[in-house]
Amino acid sequence: GFSADGLHAGFKKRKMDFGWIVSEKPASVAGVYTTNKVIAAPLIVTKTSVKKAGKMRAIVVNSGVANSCTGTQGLEDAYTMQEWTAEKLGVEPDMIGVASTGIIGELLPMDTLKNGLSKLVVNGNANDFAKAILTTDTATKTIAVTETFGRDVVTMAGVAKGSGMI
């Protein structure tokens, strides 16, 4: 199954701003990506891993700092975010997706990231993850549906952010 957690790490002044979704085992993954000419560092890292591995164990997300338009340092920081998360979960880096949302042009405060990562737990609070990925949104967007297929009971869940600025 999957679990999630979210917390306040310090990317923002007061609100939750860091979280992850973790799978017990490698899960098939696909991506839909921007067609913009400017592509943020976390997207480059995640897109590369999705193409290489086709499976992931987790995605880790910070909000408040987008790590977009940050050049070589931003890309290095996104790979470091992936590596640190992989180390914490005991998996290969390509099993980790990374995402950042927030202010464009700012580098990730890596001490804040490392401290926040040390506090994330597997089997944390999924609602806190939904709060942690918000930027200008006014409400969380989540859904879960359980269906029975023969003898198997399957729960599908989703969490999203966005449209607050549109």
Model-derived features with residue positions:
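Short, charged beta->alpha transition segments
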Residues: 42-52
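Glycine- and acidic-rich phosphate- and metal-coordinating loops
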Residues: 57-64, 95-101
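Alpha-helical support elements that line or immediately flank enzyme active sites
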Residues: 60-89
